[in-house]
């Protein structure tokens, strides 16, 4: 039914266009038809305008030219004004093949607030969902994340650690913020979305497409005045987000500047039914979205200096910081506390951050020379850090386990244990003897002696385990008919009395109050803070094991880290026979197990971009050429530790936190011994390590593009780019964060040999192990070079005034990331070995489009075919023995390899119709329609999960002739994701025979209504209703973010409990108010 509706609309629009051409008033040259004018004339003529200009090419539009500048420069100024502060594309003009341009005005009209909103009303491109970390790049034509290039002002943004082995080992556990960074929408002047191979513009990574983000410039606002000011205040109910953005621009003589300051504060995105779900449920079956507090702060600063009309200097600072703090209630690992119940339990706290800083210096030259018309040199220094901080602790203070003191235990001035009432505590551990007289009747009258007449077996059954000796207290001549026997029983009494109440320490019920862990044997020494003891007395009163008597323990006072401690002396030879000390609980603090994982990408880049217009005979040529050089350092730093919180007076401090203790002086040739206290939480241990070898990437590139028109009917686009990439690992032992030894030992180099069983306790064996690890890392970390050629060939044919044919053939590539080459891990169940022989991935796109257009609008249909080669994927390499490990445990090895091929095909429809051209009654009204269908397979039969199901977006828009108000209605439809188009790569490990994904998205339709009004010149009010019909639905990107294993983004795969957490929000609203001067 959906396809039928789509086809009816498509053909109806096409017939309407054709009819409007046939019955239009005759004219020799419609305003948007080919003319004999040069190709650099007004932009609404259907020329083959450059489709692959680099995003950082010169913008030869100075704003502070002297008043006597020539008319050509004035035209250029007018053009830049159009591209910045208003729409830069004629919505009636036919689009370029596989390209969508969105201006700041378009984004404002769509009320976009993040990158997901950039593509909300687009088809064929979506945003990758990453659970608690938000979004991670885009998915286009079957590929995603690093295979879709993302640039901001010509700079590549941070890539994820794309090694599939790394993802399987770490990504499912919520410890790494392994996502691609985003951008602040309010700072963007223009967004260009290109589908298909696109390395000509973006270099490595543009296999499925690219998204180029260009930031605002003062010249966008200061054409007809010397200042600009704007303030916007907004609110979104879906995530309770508050928006504040201030834009200031000004010009004085030769200087101009702009500042865009934006702040967003909100919470988690509220899923459908958010207010109805139980907030207390923890684990993977939780249906309510996990709570987070999110902030995003951005500052874009640009200062320009233009002393003459041909020379311009600029300084740029683009600062962006995004934070998210909250709780992972859906985290699947929870502690199990035996016998004890507490008001508060351990909880995972999250603190994630993405920070980007870019400082750039730009020089632009507008002097026309034989070699260029414009020249632009840009130096950029960008640093991007993605961080994930997790803290696992109980934040209920004294309500938490091991921190409470419900009995109010403390030591008084005499160092005697007392309770809340101030009275001394009492302890008793004795065996209490009891004598019971049993009167046993004669049951055997024929017995010779008195004790022969008694059934002693019955008495033994009554007192099992008690010795019974056949004898009677009465004499044999006693006339009585019974036998009296004294049974001696022993009952163990183990009690603790405090606050006037006695607790039975043998009772399971009382273990909730007094547990075995609260009794400290004195066969070892303890170190207590003098905050809880009277250290001036230097004695402490404890309890003997079997009698309710006090025992004096001597201790010495020592001072460490400016704090005094009392160190008790050993008072017993073994744990069972010695006396006891009682404490409120064992630890006396809350342990915070924390980790912070930072991924850093730091780039230094120089761009040289030139343009030149040539007329050769009757042909018009627009040349773009130049190059770049960049140096990018990518590294990982992992910090992990164990920190005490809410430390109490009874906490047992370690005597020594060193890893090894000095050798004994009593034993000849003794070696240092491993310190058992080295792992104590009170040592505040911090480990610094990394799973990745730091790598410096050097990239050089040259490109040349020629857009030329042969005549009014034929135009071509030719481009070529050469990239050279070199990886230089920079692992320096002792300085670089350490790679864990066990990940690499004996992988390639077998010497020096060491005894793995003694390496953790013997310093000599540990040194050998570290030397072995260093040798293997050196063997792995060898430089690697890649080179790649990218090209594009396009043609545009305009055989008729209303018909356009476009064809494009392009090639893109993606060099293997450093982690795909060098990542190493060693474990019997899952070992990964590096692969220095990986080849670049390549993509070749063939696309053909047909466009019918006139003044009324256009409808474009296109078909495409993209072939991917050398796809990098994880492959099982088999089992083998590893030197230094038991041969009984073979290691399972995996490795990144190049897969042969993948293929994606599909077709798209895009249309934009202005109804005012049909009748004046519909002036201001327009219709739009977009549709995408695509299908893809890897190696011929494996579905590509990144492909979206069929999607369509219908649009109805109205804009007042004087732009005083406007309305937009969007109807978005997505078909169900079919099972045969999904692939679960873990189905064999899960013991399944079906390789499809069980939980998928169903068909859904949503309606959004957006509008704005300008009651006065300087004021704009905007509002929007999203999911107007309150439809419950889940997108395919959200559904496929559910992980089959791990601790994060999990649901119950059998019942589906927890999947509601991934559903889109209910009906929600956005509103904003903006003042402009």
UniProtKB/Swiss-Prot annotation:
Family under the similarity heading: Belongs to the TonB-dependent receptor family. Hemoglobin/haptoglobin binding protein subfamily.
PROSITE patterns for this protein: TONB_DEPENDENT_REC_2, TONB_DEPENDENT_REC_3
Location relative to the cell: Cell outer membrane
Domain TBDR beta-barrel: 224-1077
Segments carrying motif TonB box: 78-85
Residues annotated as signal peptide: 1-24
This protein's GO CC annotations: cell outer membrane
Membrane topology category: Multi-pass membrane protein
Sequence repeat copies, ranges: 26-29, 30-33, 34-37, 38-41, 42-45, 46-49, 50-53, 54-57, 58-61, 62-65, 66-69
Organism: Haemophilus influenzae
Record Pfam families: Plug, PT, TonB_dep_Rec_b-barrel
Region described as 11 X 4 AA tandem repeats of P-T-N-Q: 26-69
Official protein name in the record: Hemoglobin and hemoglobin-haptoglobin-binding protein A
Misc note: This protein is subject to phase-variable expression associated with alteration in the length of the CCAA repeat region. This mechanism is called slipped-strand mispairing. Addition or loss of CCAA repeat units would change the reading frame and result in introduction of stop codons downstream of the repeat region. This may be a mechanism of regulation and a way to avoid the immunological response of the host.
Biased composition (Low complexity): 26-70
UniProt motif TonB C-terminal box: location: 1060-1077
Keywords: Cell outer membrane, Membrane, Receptor, Repeat, Signal, TonB box, Transmembrane, Transmembrane beta strand, Transport
Region (Disordered): 25-72
GO molecular function, one term: siderophore uptake transmembrane transporter activity
Function: Acts as a receptor for hemoglobin or the hemoglobin/haptoglobin complex of the human host and is required for heme uptake.
TBDR plug domain span: 89-216
